[in-house]
Design a protein with these regions (language model features):
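P-loop NTPase motor domains
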Residues: 1, 42-54, 60-211
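Glycine-rich phosphate-binding loop of nucleotide-binding enzymes
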Residues: 1-60
Length: 211
């Protein structure tokens, strides 16, 4: 018996995939399984309403927001640092961008030192994308100079990540904590149809939801 089961549902349009999945998910919920779904197309709105779940739709006025940097000391591990590194790289490089080994190591170092500054040295006021961005803008040039690194496009880093910093067009996305009441819900649907064609927001929001 495993608690990490997986399956894949494939079929042409109109073949009943959503109908089947509604049935499967309902049965799982009835067996006391907590359900969190990411959907495009409003396929599970009716089921969510039926079971009294929480249905959250992404809109420009009310984007889905989370603060992936707000973690406890015991939650800081290789997996979490890797997740945050992928998040930063997604904003900086996009889904198709090439990441060099130097850039990968650089961002990993900055993230690690950022948390050290907060947990060990108490030099950072709070954990958020805002404070990470502020810290990285100062620390990255220092690391580049200390190690004589070349080929780091610091201007593009500062420019692209600024969209998610305070005052930017997506300033709420990575800085506002998820409603803690959601942790008490047993059935949650995140509807992100409105950003399914956005090459940055769609993978980014999906990534932070799954975290």
């Amino acid at each position: 018996i495993t608690d990490n089961s997986n399956f894949f549902c494939l079929g042409p349009s109109g073949s009943g995939k959503s109908f089947h999945m509604n049935s499967v998910v309902r049965q799982m919920w009835e067996q006391n399984t907590d359900v969190v779904m990411v959907d495009t197309g409003n396929s599970y709105e009716g089921l969510c309403e039926y079971v009294g779940g929480k249905y959250i739709s992404y809109t420009d006025e009310h984007p889905i927001t989370m603060n992936p940097f707000a973690i406890k000391r015991e939650e800081l591990n290789i997996e979490k640092i890797g997740f945050l590194k992928n998040l930063v790289m997604l904003i900086w490089k996009g889904t198709q961008g090439e990441v060099t080994k130097t850039e990968d190591r650089l961002i990993e170092q900055v993230i690690t030192e950022y948390f050290d500054e907060y947990f060990m040295k108490k030099q950072i006021e709070n954990l958020s994308f805002n404070t990470f961005y502020e810290y990285s803008k100062v620390r990255i040039p220092q690391i580049i100079k200390e190690n004589n690194l070349a080929g780091i496009d610091l201007a593009s880093y500062n420019y692209l990540l600024k969209d998610f910093y305070k005052g930017g067009s997506h300033e709420l996305t990575l800085n506002e904590n998820l409603d803690t009441k959601l942790f008490d819900e047993t059935f949650i649907v995140f509807e992100i149809d409105s950003i399914k064609d956005d090459p940055l927001l769609f993978p980014l929001v999906t990534l932070i939801i799954m975290d």
